[in-house]
Amino acid sequence: MKNYRLAVDENGSPFVLNSKGSIDFGYITEEMNLSPAPIRVAEGDESYGLAHMVKNHSDQLSQCGFADVPAFVEYVTEHFTTIKEGHTVSYLLEVNEDRNHTLFISLSRTEDYWNVISGGVF
């Protein structure tokens, strides 16, 4: 079995595991007109990833019924119906409900995965 805990992002931050024990939460495919690659979330820091989302959005996500940040990321990556161009080099993945469940993602410098920057319910 592969030890995913050894995998790190381009900043050296370990990737978070999804509920299935994988670092890949979802995928961007060629049909989406973006670079095809898996979607991953790193532990990060205050500016991106899990640490950023826990600090700035975990209360909101809890109020919307999500057990934790990884559960929210998994939900959006499995159910998004809209992709919008964001600021600079980011894109928004959205599940359109009464309020948008949104993830902000950007392609890694190596272009081999999409990194979750932030997200929330807006």
Model-derived regions: residue spans:
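Ribonuclease/tRNase effector modules and their secretory precursors
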Residues: 1-122
